[in-house]
């Protein structure tokens, strides 16, 4: 039977010495966001009324990074065990709510598994998440009598017989708030570690005749913790393999699932193709029949139907309408917008710029703070000079303009519809509709000229 409310405690006070880092362990990232954020997200999706984050090492950096006003920050000044950590949070527990305990360094725990654990919690008892391992060395063992859970024995305190038990404690459990506070008040540190173990509440509950229901996760990897960078890298690959599998089964063609990283949320239309070594970050939407070439990075962008992004292009905070083509080696920075059928070629960079329908910037170009009309040709080497050393200014180019190669447009400047800018021109004044503009130095020919001779 479920209580009407539930709060979550996330233990995140450890320094993570084996990470060999000045950054708190739980802030190391998996799939582009801190491990602890994955756990917070799971708690939120589960419907937690309150999330208590128990912190210690690097608390200020934790607060600066997470920036979540809904978190209740609970300081554990001394790390005296998991039971001690829960004791710091206990004053915030309501008697009539359930308390779910999670860990900031166990990032793959799923909402589905936690919901099953919550559903399985007996009235007045404890829901406990356990797994069976071929090699349970180092983990707390689940002790049973006649099939019923009676307690948890930490590895260092276990007898040889108990160490043969393969069912181990994951550390994740749920109990009523009033019961949790009572059991926490009875904990002692009379053990090999001299710490207060949260696991001792299992024996206390059993002694009171309370039922302990053990639940297994859908995947063992959900309960894997991180103590070093090797373990973190392994969980990263597990997570990415799971995301790739979901995409493949939903109809997305990943040419090499083992070389695809999703570090955010991806929504795809029909018949999307993604080549090897592509990284998706933030919130990305790909329309129908979109093709992403090898080595591309797409972040917080919307890509319209039938667009093709050629290899090694970077697209960030950009919006592409239908049938646009990008790259290879193109860079769309925040604020870039391509209207239907526009083309951005190799070594072209756009920032806060709009390229109109059917317009093309094929090679070696910078378009910043610019508004470019429809059917415009931007020649190779064109630069919108948008910065005077203090302020940014805008360039406006009308429809059907032809901009020759090696042109500089010194903003603020406007080029009218149908104008032609000759190659090598520096445009410093507004250009009227249909004008031809050129600013070349007259070409000089010197007959009989000889190159200088190198001095010996």
Curated annotation (Swiss-Prot):
Q: Gene3D superfamilies per the record?
A: Hexapeptide repeat proteins, Spore Coat Polysaccharide Biosynthesis Protein SpsA, Chain A
Reactions catalysed, semicolon-separated, are:
alpha-D-glucosamine 1-phosphate + acetyl-CoA = N-acetyl-alpha-D-glucosamine 1-phosphate + CoA + H(+); N-acetyl-alpha-D-glucosamine 1-phosphate + UTP + H(+) = UDP-N-acetyl-alpha-D-glucosamine + diphosphate
Q: Which PANTHER family match?
A: BIFUNCTIONAL PROTEIN GLMU, NUCLEOTIDYL TRANSFERASE
Recorded source organism is Salmonella typhimurium (strain LT2 / SGSC1412 / ATCC 700720)
InterPro entries the UniProt entry points to: Bifunctional_GlmU (IPR005882), GlmU-like (IPR050065), GlmU_C_LbH (IPR038009), Hexapep (IPR001451), Hexapep_transf_CS (IPR018357), MobA-like_NTP_Trfase (IPR025877), Nucleotide-diphossugar_trans (IPR029044), Trimer_LpxA-like_sf (IPR011004)
One Pfam short name: Hexapep
Q: Which HAMAP family match?
A: GlmU
Keyword Acyltransferase among UniProt keywords: yes
Main location per UniProt? cytoplasm
Any one biological process term the GO annotation gives: peptidoglycan biosynthetic process
Annotated region Pyrophosphorylase: the residues are: 1-229
Q: What is its EC number?
A: 2.7.7.23, 2.3.1.157
What are the start and end residues of every segment in region (N-acetyltransferase)?
A: 251-456
GO MF assignments? glucosamine-1-phosphate N-acetyltransferase activity; magnesium ion binding; UDP-N-acetylglucosamine diphosphorylase activity
Q: Which family does it belong to?
A: In the N-terminal section; belongs to the N-acetylglucosamine-1-phosphate uridyltransferase family. In the C-terminal section; belongs to the transferase hexapeptide repeat family.
Annotated positions binding acetyl-CoA? 380, 386-387, 405, 423, 440
Positions binding Mg(2+) in this chain are: 105, 227
Which NCBIfam families does the entry link to?
glmU (TIGR01173), PRK09451.1 (NF006986)
Superkingdom of the organism of origin: Bacteria
Binding annotation for UDP-N-acetyl-alpha-D-glucosamine: 11-14, 25, 76, 81-82, 103-105, 140, 154, 169, 227, 333, 351, 366, 377
List, separated by semicolons, the cofactors it needs: Mg(2+)
Give the cofactor note text.
Binds 1 Mg(2+) ion per subunit.
Q: Subunit structure, per the record?
A: Homotrimer.
Q: In which pathway does it act?
A: Nucleotide-sugar biosynthesis; UDP-N-acetyl-alpha-D-glucosamine biosynthesis; N-acetyl-alpha-D-glucosamine 1-phosphate from alpha-D-glucosamine 6-phosphate (route II): step 2/2; Nucleotide-sugar biosynthesis; UDP-N-acetyl-alpha-D-glucosamine biosynthesis; UDP-N-acetyl-alpha-D-glucosamine from N-acetyl-alpha-D-glucosamine 1-phosphate: step 1/1; Bacterial outer membrane biogenesis; LPS lipid A biosynthesis
Please report the name of this protein according to its UniProt entry.
Answer: Bifunctional protein GlmU
GO CC annotation terms, alphabetical:
cytoplasm; membrane
């Amino acid at each position: 039977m479920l209580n009407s409310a539930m709060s979550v405690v996330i233990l995140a006070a450890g320094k993570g010495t084996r990470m060999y880092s000045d950054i708190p362990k739980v802030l190391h990232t998996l799939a582009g966001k801190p491990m602890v954020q994955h756990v917070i997200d799971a708690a939120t999706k589960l419907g937690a009324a309150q999330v208590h984050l128990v912190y210690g090492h690097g608390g200020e950096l934790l607060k600066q990074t997470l920036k979540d006003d809904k978190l209740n920050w609970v300081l554990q000044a001394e790390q005296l065990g998991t039971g001690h950590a829960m004791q710091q949070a206990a004053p915030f527990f309501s008697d009539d709510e359930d308390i779910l305990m999670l860990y900031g360094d166990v990032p793959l725990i799923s909402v589905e598994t936690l919901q099953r654990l919550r559903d399985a919690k007996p009235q007045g008892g404890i829901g406990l998440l356990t797994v069976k391992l071929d090699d349970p060395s180092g983990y707390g063992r689940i002790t049973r009598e006649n099939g019923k859970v009676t307690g948890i024995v930490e590895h260092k305190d276990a007898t040889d017989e108990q160490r043969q038990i393969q069912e181990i404690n994951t550390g994740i459990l749920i109990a009523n708030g009033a019961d949790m506070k009572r059991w926490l008040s009875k904990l002692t540190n009379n053990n090999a570690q001299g710490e207060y173990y949260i696991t001792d509440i299992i024996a206390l509950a059993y002694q009171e005749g309370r039922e302990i229901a053990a639940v297994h996760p859908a995947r063992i990897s959900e309960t894997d913790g991180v103590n070093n960078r090797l373990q973190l890298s392994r969980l990263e690959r597990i997570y990415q393999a799971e995301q790739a599998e979901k995409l493949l089964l939903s109809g997305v063609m990943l040419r090499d699932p083992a070389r695809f990283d999703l570090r955010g949320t991806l929504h795809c239309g029909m018949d999307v193709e993604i080549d090897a070594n592509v990284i998706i970050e933030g919130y990305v939407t790909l329309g129908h029949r979109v093709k992403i070439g090898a080595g591309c990075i797409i972040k917080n962008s919307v890509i319209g139907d039938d667009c093709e992004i050629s290899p090694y292009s970077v697209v960030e905070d950009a919006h592409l309408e239908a049938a646009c083509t990008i790259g290879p080696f193109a860079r769309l920075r925040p604020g870039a917008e391509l209207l239907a059928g526009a083309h951005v070629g190799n070594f072209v960079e756009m920032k806060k710029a709009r390229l109109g329908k059917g317009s093309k910037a094929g090679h070696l170009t910078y378009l910043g703070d610019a508004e470019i009309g429809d059917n415009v040709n931007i020649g190779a080497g064109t630069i919108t000079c948008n910065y005077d050393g203090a302020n940014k200014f805008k360039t406006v180019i009308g429809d059907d303009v032809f901009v020759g190669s090696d042109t500089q447009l010194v903003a603020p400047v406007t080029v009218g519809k149908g104008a032609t800018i000759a190659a090598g021109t520096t445009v410093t004044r507004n250009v009227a509709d249909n004008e031809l503009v050129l600013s070349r130095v007259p070409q000089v020919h010197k007959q009989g000229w000889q190159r200088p001779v190198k001095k010996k």
